[in-house]
């Protein structure tokens, strides 16, 4: 009798436990459905903005005051036995608005990296993601929310919602148009580099000849095809900057070999990484003979590098690209 009662109690408890687990699953499912419905509702309104603002071209392009005659750089490459196969036109979609966004990302990367990587992981599917920020610092929460707000305003996010205390969560879904995918998967970092260069050229009021060659597709002397990220020259010096937002392991040696082919006292090759501490960057520099930089130190490094060409420093408000409408 006692055994039978124990068996019944155990069976009842088992059913209750299943019910609780099942209820929890139902609640979670309902939350996901509610989020999806909210996203769909927002998309109907937000996609109207997208159609009108997918390509908001600003008249104040950051290249306006730069001589973009890249002949000096091209001649240098040809003397090294390099054939230039194709040079794309400057991407008109990467206008001042996106350069400003790239600058925000680059200068605050450590504070927004968790949210950025969560967004990037959903670009292929467009699915929503819930980001728990309970362990974030207040600064990380603030900058992450600002980052998402900026993306949403530009229609880079189809959906964005911030849940305040006690949840401290961000729910978002990325837009999957080509401009967004291209920019957030890595082109933002190139844009950040170009933006910082331009800003410092203005800041130091550099009068030397300055030119850019962006994303040229080349053929090396051994017949291998290759694509360079950013080449820019100041006077007789040429700076070559490659940038990687993710796995760099398969590229460092390739870049090092190309640097040896292009070797010259006038060439300064650099590799910019986002996910690698400067201590590791220093080790890579010593190992491969190519200067490797962490994004946290890039702006300061570039400042010191371009300072040598300064004519005189002009007031900050005059070189701030975001606010200077007459460059």
Question: Language-model features: where?
Answer:
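Extended alpha-helical segments
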Residues: 1-52
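Intrinsically disordered, low-complexity Ser/Thr/Pro/Gly-rich regulatory segments
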Residues: 30, 48-327
